């Protein structure tokens, strides 16, 4: 018979499992929000806000033909409620239109940027909750807690959750999609097909990269499930399963397409090629997919390890992950994923195999296919999977320390190693604060700009710190080499002169890392001098006395 104390203990545990993940996610959101005041807008934020407002205000989708609208709508809703509007004669440039909104609205720049960034927090909440429930279903509550804690203490996740960008939103919806994909592969019921279609539609409505991420993951999961069932089904059962999977996949695909089209709103547009009016989403979704294909086919200026290249490098993301991931997660996550995959194969359990298989598949795809090498943010979707491996390895080490057959020294060593790595991971929350976006691990050394720059180190985020430091030093005039999307004429800067590449001057000089590394060595002459100060993580301040 179960006593009252046991019942109360169990009910308390269930309450903790029910509300604990939400509390953890809210704490992560508060931590992210506490960094907003430090940073001005990063490069992509004005255009995302302008694109969202254009859809809300005017029912058209005019800026940047590579991204669907869901994340942008979330960012634009707060500013729109605060009175921000797309100007009637808005600029054809999304960056300029976004600047006009941020700097020339009735609400202040800080208010609008804060409200826009707040629109990203629901996606961080969703990411934490989807991670926790997916892992709990496969591995239990202890693993769910550990993996979610590892994920929410990852600087790259926190940094990109703190700005208006689409990478955390698509990561959150892809993790939800992975979970629902796995459930669907195990049993493609009507209910699960509908849930999968909704999740996939929302993910693709956020960023086009969700298409290959979810499609490849589904193929790998389905192949693994078929291999596990090989020889266990009769020919009649195989035919029945094919029909179930085919029907479920078709239903999910139709639902996903409908949701993607609906995300662009109810407006109809005339398409000359077919001579009729269609929903805006039919036209725009096609343009978004083609835009990404065109961008990838033609490349993007990129920097890695002292070199610049238009088409990138197959190993770019391997290097980025090596220096932008916490060392504890690297040491635990990769072996943990391998161990889970091996254990799943032996036990013939799909759920244990999925994280490692999906991680390897998506990493290989990004390395071999992507020619847009502008930051680890494009593979943020790998971090939830790596966090599962890290949680599994840490838990296995701790459980080994409790095994009665283990020797005392082995127990102590395993327990100490697990504790040190977990505490090291969590300590990063303090040591990296508030610069989660520009954080690098110890492998990068003292000069991470020699390895990566764009959006990993310098995304234009430190301009506010620069203006504060120049005011503190009472510097009367500067030469400025800065690449970002802020309106410099509206920032609190002293009089400045743009510093062109190869223009050797004296006096106070401001140089950001993006200008240094992506200007064809035009500012390398400054490397002969010691900067007075590194402002934030991405701007150097020099003083060269008159000759």
Q: Which residue stretches match the model-derived regions?
A:
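C-terminal luminal/periplasmic domains and tails of membrane-associated envelope-modifying transferases
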Residues: 4-7, 441-547
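Membrane-interface transmembrane helices that cradle and orient dolichyl/undecaprenyl
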Residues: 177-193
């Amino acid at each position: 018979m179960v006593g009252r104390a046991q019942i109360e203990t169990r009910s308390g545990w269930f309450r903790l499992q029910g509300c604990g993940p939400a509390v953890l996610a809210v704490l992560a959101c508060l931590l992210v929000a506490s960094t907003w005041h430090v940073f001005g807008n990063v490069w992509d934020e004005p255009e995302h806000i302008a694109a969202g407002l254009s859809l809300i205000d005017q029912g058209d989708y005019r800026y940047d033909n590579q991204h669907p609208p869901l994340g942008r709508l979330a960012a634009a809703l707060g500013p729109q409620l605060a009175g921000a509007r797309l100007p009637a004669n808005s600029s054809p440039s999304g960056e300029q239109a976004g600047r006009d909104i941020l700097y020339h609205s009735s609400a202040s720049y800080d208010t609008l940027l804060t409200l826009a960034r707040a629109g990203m927090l629901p996606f961080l909440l969703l990411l934490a909750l989807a991670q926790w429930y997916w892992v709990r279903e496969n591995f239990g509550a202890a693993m769910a807690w550990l993996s979610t804690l590892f994920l929410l203490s990852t600087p790259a996740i926190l940094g990109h959750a703190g700005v208006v960008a689409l990478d955390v939103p698509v990561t959150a919806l892809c993790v939800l999609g992975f979970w629902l994909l796995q459930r669907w592969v195990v049993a493609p019921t009507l209910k699960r097909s509908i849930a999968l279609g909704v999740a996939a539609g929302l993910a693709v409505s956020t960023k086009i990269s969700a298409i290959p991420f979810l499609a490849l993951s589904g193929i790998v999961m389905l192949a693994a499930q078929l291999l596990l069932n090989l020889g266990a089904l009769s020919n009649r059962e195989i035919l029945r399963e094919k029909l179930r999977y085919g029907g479920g996949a078709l239903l999910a695909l139709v639902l996903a397409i409908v949701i993607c089209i609906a995300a662009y709103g109810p407006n109809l547009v005339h398409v000359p090629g077919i001579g009729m009016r269609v929903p805006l989403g039919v036209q725009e979704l096609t343009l978004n997919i083609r835009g990404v294909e065109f961008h990838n086919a033609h490349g993007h200026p990129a920097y890695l390890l002292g070199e610049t290249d238009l088409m990138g490098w197959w190993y770019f993301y391997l290097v980025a992950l090596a220096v932008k991931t916490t060392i504890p997660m690297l040491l635990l996550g990769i072996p943990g994923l391998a161990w889970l995959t091996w254990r799943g194969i032996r036990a013939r359990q799909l759920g244990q195999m999925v994280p490692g298989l999906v991680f390897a598949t998506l990493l290989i795809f990004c390395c071999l296919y992507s020619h847009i090498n502008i930051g680890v943010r494009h593979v943020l979707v790998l971090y939830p999977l790596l966090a599962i491996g890290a949680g599994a390895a840490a838990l296995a080490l701790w459980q080994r320390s409790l095994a009665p057959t283990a020797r005392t020294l082995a127990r102590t060593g395993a327990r100490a190693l697990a504790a040190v790595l977990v505490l090291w991971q969590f300590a990063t929350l303090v040591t990296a604060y508030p610069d989660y976006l520009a954080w690098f691990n110890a492998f990068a050394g003292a000069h991470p700009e020699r390895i990566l720059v764009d959006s990993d180190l310098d995304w234009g985020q430190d301009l506010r710190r620069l203006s504060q430091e120049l005011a503190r030093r009472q510097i009367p005039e500067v030469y400025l080499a800065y690449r970002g999307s802020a309106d410099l004429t509206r920032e609190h800067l002293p009089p400045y002169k743009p510093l062109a590449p190869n223009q050797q001057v004296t006096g106070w000089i401001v140089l950001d890392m993006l200008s240094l590394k992506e200007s064809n060595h035009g500012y390398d002459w400054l490397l002969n001098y010691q900067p007075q100060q590194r402002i934030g993580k991405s701007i150097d301040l020099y003083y060269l006395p008159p000759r």
